[in-house]
């Protein structure tokens, strides 16, 4: 991939499309990178109404944007508008990164990369692990794909609506036939049998206690068992706080956000950026927003 700084002197336009997008940390993260690498560019947020997504993408292409990130609720719809998909986007059925190149709209899924590498950074190995995925949406599908790809020993999807979870199971097993995937209801979780527990829902953003929703809480980890509670939400949710208090390893979604963003940046600009700078930037942005919120109370 060519480093675009050597390819053109034109200003680079990037962005993120979703609804809502006001909470997104991606503009702060990517604009910091553009400044760091002395790239004349800007990363902008675009809140798009449902039904207007295809027009928004075509409009950004007409405006000569280099690429955009796609967030909720448009990741699945983005698959349909792309002329080309990478293997992960095609398999998962979800696009979070678009590149406008050679009159084509190219779709990528870097969320899978972000989750996989963040687990590795934490010192855990998905291979042969027993993994619980809480949720049945697009994020759960991505997590399940990564676990199956890495030969997890057992994957159990826990969701209120079993039909959605069964669909994920069926789709992923069609790609990885030997994967061991089960579907259960929330109340049947036995934390003692699990190595990695992933919250793939948005519960926790507003302070909801996911353990209350699923009807069970992990016991104190007196044996110091190696077990990871992982939240795809990038703030300290009750899920993370309670698991940590009980003595377990925890990881929120900050590194997943950073790593998927780093991969997107590389796709657009041919340059893999400095991960630590990205992590520092989003931590500072979260702290700044928290301070601003507290000052208005």
Residue ranges, per PLM feature:
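Phosphate/diphosphate ligand-binding glycine-rich loop within oxidoreductases
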Residues: 2, 7-122, 236, 242
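Short glycine-/small-residue-rich Rossmann-like dinucleotide-binding loops
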Residues: 73, 199-203, 233-234
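Short acidic low-complexity segments
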Residues: 176-194
